Amino acid sequence: MLGICRGRRKFLAASLTVLFVPAVTWIYLFAGSFEDGKPVSLSPLESQPHSPRYTASSQRDRESLEVRMREVEEENRVLRKQLSLAQGRSPSHHRGNHSKTYSMEEGTGDSESLRAGIVAGNSSECGQQPAVEKCETIHVAIVCAGYNASRDVVTLVKSVLFHRRNPLHFHLIADAIAKQILATLFQTWMVPAVRIDFYDADELKSEVSWIPNKHYSGIYGLMKLVLTKTLPSNLERVIVLDTDITFATDIAELWAVFHKFKGQQVLGLVENQSDWYLGNLWKNHRPWPALGRGYNTGVILLLLDKLRKMKWEQMWRLTAERELMSMLSTSLADQDIFNAVIKQNPFLVYQLPCFWNVQLSDHTRSEQCYRDVSDLKVIHWNSPKKLRVKNKHVEFFRNLYLTFLEYDGNLLRRELFGCPSEADVNSENLQKQLSEPDEDDLCYEFRRERFTVHRTHLYFLHYEYEPASDNTDVTLVAQLSMDRLQMLEAICKHWEDPISLALYLSDAEAQQFLRYAQGSEVLMSRHNVGYHIVYKEGQFYPVNLLRNVAMKHISTPYMFLSDIDFLPMYGLYEYLRKSVTQLDLANTKKALIIPAFETLRYRLSFPKSKAELLSMLDMGTLFTFRYHVWTKGHAPTNFAKWRTATTPYRVEWEADFEPYVVVRKDCPEYDRRFVGFGWNKVAHIMELDAQEYEFTVLPNAYMIHMPHAPSFDITKFRSNKQYRICLKTLKEEFQQDMSRHYGFAALKYLTAENNS
């Protein structure tokens, strides 16, 4: 308290200094500008010697006065700058925007409270406390449905997390798709002092499905009406946000506005910044009833406890039923109904200053809300055109949005010091696991990677696929980084059926991928490709984690474990479905091997049959995969036998065997200790053998590896001795773990390794 008083005394002293110095200066200059009781101009143009009274001495005096005046003005400018900084650091700054008034934006009865806020913010009374306590939890509700909205929510949440200083509790009204995506995202994001609760949007459909709605948000655009019924009964207040919102300030400032509600005010809203509700946008335009310009519901402050007491549910239903008799449907979803209720009950609304919802719609007048960047609090992209909307300041707004769109979300994992938080079991387990490896161990970074939790965004693009009813469907599974993006279109042309891909990208690269995909006719025509973004963290490429993510999120009973550099033969999908049935994969432990070949040519006339492939093999256009570098990796496939085989044949496991296989979706995961280059597939095939999988080579299947520049990890493997030493150490530890897990039968792997 004493510190606050001292701060205010400094603030008052600085204010008096700024006022006092100019006053004394101008008195001094004014007195000095008289000679013999007559005024003398200080203007350089008027001070030319045109009178006998003019002397060299008086000219020097005037020049010195002008120099002194400029010095005083510069001192005054510096003092003003210091004063503005002091205002920015003062506690009153965090109570809301009390220092600015916009009479045209304030609602009835609001100007008094705003003026009171200004007085309170600038008074020297030391007993006043901040409107939002340091560790007070701020509650935010968001309606989210579908794949695209899930991406938008991430950008919104980033902007909120970037500025926040308080614990947050997000209440997400989500459909099954959004829940799966966002639950995984927040679970792997592990942001401290953030709690997430989900509410099933599909269960709420019956509450609003009777309302015809023409808005592009569909039925989900009406669900804000039922928040009083949906959210916990003990929740008193909540900030409700659209998914197309971007914050440019601490959300606690908006939360503090709740303390300014008076009487029966239960809704905090910003006036609509277009002429939509005035009905003059085009001829015969007939909007829903609204108070003046109406209000925009992209940002809402809801006093839930009072709304429940007022029987809000009954209030909005009766209003909607009455208006629908003449309007037939809503045009702006819940916003039309909120405005119709407010038209009948204007006392319900507290009008927020318009900078809390700067609307960038097609007919907006939002530029009247702000004079400079510091006025902006919340930006609302409430046009179907989103970033393509026309606005004279749209470039600035777009850059602000892109800042959060591409911002590294891992940097938002910072702790809120001084605020107690609930114990997070996952976080505690992670810290325990990370503390186990010895930091002095030369392979510490390798061991640490095994426990690193990577932020994961499932189904980054729209996904839609219904598996075949005969239970023979196969999904191609692969992983990639940004430098292999060019392979996607080629793979999609060769494999027209379901694909599950894990992409290892930064936040900025994820947006580059999105733009690339949206600009590709081939990729946009496919809805059966699941793109799962695993965000970058650490120095190694987590190849086996990526494979596990892609494997885990398939909707078919079988999967083809491939790599992004391989193109499968045309028609492989149908051939695999037949083979799955013929070899009874559903009831047996089999791994079907797809023989792998490679070409050194970037432009290849892809063989359309086995006969064509054999011809190219004989001519030296194709080779068996890694025949000159790592023969042992695919030698057990027995390519000599494959050339003449017409029926599937069984092969035995051998050391360093790493074929590409088709297996059931319940097969073991890849071992996460192997990152970067080396032993990642070998270890998996070894475990399949330990679990008594039978390896069967398909006689009429093949895949071809396309050439590319060496990866960063293989370069490190070849050039870094310590990298190779650590890989060998991890390999030995894996073999020991196999022996402990599978017993005597696993000893053959140690023997085979010693003999190889």
From Swiss-Prot:
GO BP, one annotated term: protein O-linked mannosylation
Keyword annotations from UniProtKB, A to Z: Coiled coil, Glycoprotein, Glycosyltransferase, Golgi apparatus, Manganese, Membrane, Metal-binding, Multifunctional enzyme, Signal-anchor, Transferase, Transmembrane, Transmembrane helix
Location of this chain's protein in the cell: Golgi apparatus membrane
Topology Cytoplasmic: residue spans: 1-10
Pfam family, one: Glyco_transf_8
Coiled coil: 55-90
SUPFAM superfamilies registered for this protein in UniProt: Nucleotide-diphospho-sugar transferases (SSF53448)
Region of interest: Disordered: 42-63, 81-109
Protein name: Xylosyl- and glucuronyltransferase LARGE1
Species per Swiss-Prot/TrEMBL record: Gallus gallus (Chicken)
UniProt lineage: Eukaryota, Metazoa, Chordata, Craniata, Vertebrata
